[in-house]
């Protein structure tokens, strides 16, 4: 029952989005600007996620540079 309601909700959201896209050429400039801002924001988030995932995946492929380690001893009193 819950799966069918979820599918109906997704279908109704898709229908509303399609209707908005069809009415966009006749929309007011404010609506076009708001829609453009939402599209740019969504694209930016997706792009940043792809960059982050790519960086995390590729980071483990490269050999890590290990510097020379120096041992630290206790300080001698002056």
UniProtKB/Swiss-Prot annotation:
UniProt organism field: Bos taurus (Bovine)
Protein name: Small integral membrane protein 5
Localization annotation: Membrane
Gene designation per UniProt: SMIM5
A Gene Ontology cellular-component term: membrane
TM region(s), chain numbering: 32-52
Transmembrane helix listed as a keyword: yes
InterPro entries, per the entry: SMIM5 (IPR047133), SMIM5/18/22 (IPR031671)
Keywords: Membrane, Transmembrane, Transmembrane helix
Lineage of the organism: Eukaryota, Metazoa, Chordata, Craniata, Vertebrata
């Amino acid at each position: 029952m819950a799966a069918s309601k979820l599918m109906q909700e997704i279908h109704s959201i898709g229908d509303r989005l399609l209707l908005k896209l069809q009415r966009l050429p006749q929309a007011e400039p404010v609506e076009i600007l708001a829609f453009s801002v939402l599209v740019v924001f969504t694209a930016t988030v997706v792009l940043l996620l792809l960059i982050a995932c790519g960086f995390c995946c590729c980071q483990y492929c490269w050999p890590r540079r290990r510097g020379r380690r120096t041992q630290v001893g206790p300080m001698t009193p002056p």
